[in-house]
């Protein structure tokens, strides 16, 4: 008799656990579906902000960059030329060969007193960049600020597709590079991967003077930089791995800086 009662109690307990698991799974599924189908609730702007007709004559000069090797060299040269400020926004930044060249160049600029601000799409940064010791060493520098745009948050899954595909580099608030290339071997350099994307960049400059288009880009960057959806990236406290990575960046930058390619 007692055995039968105990058996029934266990059976009842298993049924309750099953119902609880089913209920939790169903609630999560409903939450996920709602997150994917509800319309955006933030970021409403007037259409006139993006559809205004503009007619301006300027003295700006434009250089077209079609070659991936040139695309890397232009980035490194521009970063090396910076005297006051560097702004970099990108969708995908990886610490591969070309990416580490850029990280080393940014570190070298920060070392000579240039203020560096980076904003990187949150998903790709979390997946491919935040665990890099070299990137940690860069982000730990006193002259460097890093933000991740809209990183994944389980409490706001409906924002998971709100991505930042901007790709531009601004030097001293005057010269800038803009295009379709991310910061990785897939888009930059020539020897880091067996296949590469074909893309294009432009460099816009005006003899060191701030241009109308540069001002527009800076205003846009400031708006994106201050969004509440961004999260500051806090680098790991200085440890032996960061110190080792810093030495690697210093060596990489010295090697690239002495190269005849630049």
Predicted regions: what they are:
Residues 2-144, 154-166, 171-262:
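Charged, low-complexity intrinsically disordered terminal segments
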Residues 147:
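Short, internal strand/loop/helix patches
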Residues 151:
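Short loop/turn segments at beta-alpha junctions that line or gate ligand-sensing/allosteric surfaces
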């Amino acid at each position: 008799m007692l055995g039968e009662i105990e058996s029934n109690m266990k059976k009842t307990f298993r049924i309750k656990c099953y119902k609880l698991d089913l209920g939790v799974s169903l609630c999560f599924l409903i939450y996920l579906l709602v997150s994917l189908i509800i319309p955006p609730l933030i970021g409403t702007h007037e259409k006139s902000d993006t559809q205004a007709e503009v007619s301006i004559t300027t003295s700006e000069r434009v250089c077209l960059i079609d070659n991936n090797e040139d695309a890397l060299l232009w980035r490194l040269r521009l970063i090396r030329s910076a005297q006051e400020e560097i702004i970099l926004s990108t969708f995908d930044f990886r610490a591969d060969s070309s990416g580490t060249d850029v990280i080393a160049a940014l570190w070298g600029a920060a070392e000579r007193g240039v203020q560096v601000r980076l904003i990187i799409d949150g998903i790709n940064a979390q997946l491919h960049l935040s665990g890099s010791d070299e990137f940690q060493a860069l982000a730990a520098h006193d002259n460097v600020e890093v933000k991740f745009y809209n990183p994944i948050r389980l409490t706001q899954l409906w924002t998971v597709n709100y991505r930042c595909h901007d790709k531009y580099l601004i030097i001293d608030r005057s010269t800038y590079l803009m295009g379709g290339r991310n910061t990785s071997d897939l888009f930059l350099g020539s020897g880091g991967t067996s296949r590469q994307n074909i893309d294009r960049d432009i460099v816009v400059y005006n003899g060191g003077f701030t241009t109308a288009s540069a001002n527009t880009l800076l205003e846009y960057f400031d708006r994106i930089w201050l969004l509440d959806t961004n999260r500051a990236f806090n680098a790991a406290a200085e440890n032996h791995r960061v110190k080792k990575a810093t030495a690697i960046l210093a060596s990489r930058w010295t090697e690239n800086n002495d190269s005849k390619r630049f």
